[in-house]
Amino acid sequence: VEYVEKKAKEASAPVYNYLFNLVFDVDGGKAAWHCSDIPYFFHNGEMVPVCHQEAGDMLDQVMSGAFVNFARTGNPNCPGLPQWEPCSEGKLVTMEFGPTCAAKVNLHQELLPLVLQYQPPFTPPAPAPEDDDEESGNAWVF
């Protein structure tokens, strides 16, 4: 969240934020894990058995469309996706990709307190210096 807020404040280019919140129909319901969104961004959900579920076709369409449009134009908006505005200072817009898709403003204000309540805090083993930028150090670790 801090990284997105920093990039939005600098405004060198539009900043878009998303949250993949699909619950997979496996092992009684598994929350999305790291990289579980990749098949949908590449329109390959049908090739990954765990992705075969009700929202799969819709996610293939909108997530791959958003990915291609962002790569082509810098703007992820595409047919089938609600209007997705870029983040700006004080307004962090998050597109939720899941059974339904919705653009939420400042969702982190609702979500982060819940995460902090139920998950122990994470301290990176070697935090980046305060003045570290994205091109050096470990600023990419989040």
Annotated model-derived regions:
Residues 1-142:
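C-terminal helix-and-tail extensions that cap enzymatic domains
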